[in-house]
A protein has these predicted regions:
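Short, small/polar residue-rich loop motifs at catalytic or cofactor-binding pockets
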Residues: 45-47, 69, 167-169
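C-terminal alpha-helix
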Residues: 197-205
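Hydrophobic beta-strand anchors of alpha/beta hydrolase catalytic cores
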Residues: 71-72, 106, 172
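Thiol/disulfide oxidoreductase modules built on the thioredoxin-like
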Residues: 141-197
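Short active-site neighborhood of thiol/selenol oxidoreductases, capturing the structured segment around
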Residues: 62-86, 90
Length: 206
């Protein structure tokens, strides 16, 4: 087999493997509607230790929130589209949950710590809901928590010199009071779907 042909076939194989992985990661649970709880391969670990600063400039760790249900989302305040949409979805879902929503602590963790200081995070998240807590930190701290939650993010600087953006994955993580992943939701999940799934999970915990 000639070298160019081998390279082409190798490239096709890589694309097929990646496509299969994406399809597995984003497939819904049996019986679920579009965007509802994503099923992960058995043994997949998401979540873990972190050391960050909240939007009131207080140091926090994963232990700060132990005993609480968490709704975690990663993004940044300069995000033009998916972040504000998702935060609004989270806020609306909490409203739909009524009193049950009080059991949830929503966390918005930045992937752009250079611009997202505690005060910037506070102003931003409270536009959506006063219950949402913004978390930031230094580059190493953000890299650590992103790795624990398997979050992809990368800085993208336009050639025209305009402000940079952050490319990042967009999933909502429901973590149980012991810090374990209870459910994972994709970016197309509606507030109604999110509220229903959370209500079901919390009901199972009783």
């Amino acid at each position: 087999m000639k070298a160019p042909l081998r390279l082409i076939l190798s490239g096709v194989l890589v694309v097929l493997v990646l496509a299969s992985a994406v399809l597995w990661l984003t497939r819904p649970e049996p019986g679920g509607g579009p965007g509802v709880a994503i099923a992960l391969p058995a043994g997949t670990k998401i979540g873990g230790a972190f050391n960050l600063i909240d939007d009131q400039n207080r140091p926090v760790t994963e232990q700060t929130y132990r005993g609480h249900w968490l709704l975690v989302y990663f993004g940044y305040t300069f995000c033009p589209d998916v972040c504000p949409t998702t935060l609004q979805t989270i806020a609306d879902a909490l409203d739909k949950l009524g009193k049950t929503g009080a059991q949830i602590t929503p966390l918005f963790i930045t992937v752009d710590p250079a611009r997202d200081t505690p005060s910037v995070m506070a102003r931003y998240v409270h536009q959506f809901d006063s219950r949402i807590i913004g978390l930031t930190g230094n580059d190493a701290q953000i890299a650590e928590v992103a790795k624990a939650y398997r979050v992809y993010y990368a800085k993208e600087t336009p050639k025209d010199g305009t402000a940079y953006t952050m490319d990042h994955s967009s999933f909502i993580y429901l973590m149980d009071p012991e810090g374990r992943l209870a459910a994972l939701f994709g970016p197309q999940t509606t507030a109604k779907e999110l509220a229903a799934a959370i209500g079901q999970k919390l009901g199972q915990d009783k």
